[in-house]
Amino acid sequence: SLTEELKHINTLDWIEQKSNRNFKSKDTYLLSHEQFKNIKNFIYESLNKFTKNILVSDQRLVVTQCWLNKNPKGSKHHEHVHPNSIISGVFYFKQDPKLPPISFSKSIQHAMKLDPKKYNNLNSETFLLPCTDGELILFPSNLKHSVPVNMGDEPRISMSFNTFSIDTLGSEDSLTHLDIRRIMNEHN
């Protein structure tokens, strides 16, 4: 149950995003709050499994920022990506099944397109995932996503976050090597 977390959410300060009529938490480092420790543990367990089993990588991802989104009736969240992040995520609180889903869109459009006889999540340009209580969705940070207008009476509340690796990225052989610690040492 997310009762304690929901109580804490009601004590937070919010900033209105005028262009979308939605709100985000003023604090963007929410995983440092004691009240979110269970969610933090769940996020890190999920990130570790995702990195190991899906990305098949030994990279260690850490959450760099974490904030709440509140979409009251009539608000939406414009299409966007998350720069300076590898994997992003969204965790859902107290979701009415009637609330708008998250919408993902292909970031790369094809020069040629075959006309499918029937669309599915594998051949569509856009696909929707419903919001479910206590669910965590992880996705590549450069994947375009948005939230349609909330037509329901209840606000749609979600926690979003970005990640980055604390390890060296890429390889010297493929000319994609990125070692922040080495770069910092060379320039200090």
Give the positions of each predicted feature.
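A generic structural micro-feature
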Residues: 58-60, 81-85, 151-155
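A short glycine-rich, His/Asp/Glu-containing loop-to-beta-strand
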Residues: 61-69
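Ligand-binding loop in jelly-roll beta-barrel domains
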Residues: 144, 148-158
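Catalytic core of non-heme Fe(II) oxygenases with the double-stranded beta-helix
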Residues: 68-138, 148, 165-177
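Non-heme Fe(II)/2-oxoglutarate
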Residues: 1-59, 76, 155-158, 162-188
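Short edge beta-strand segments in beta-sheet-rich domains
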Residues: 63, 124, 154-158
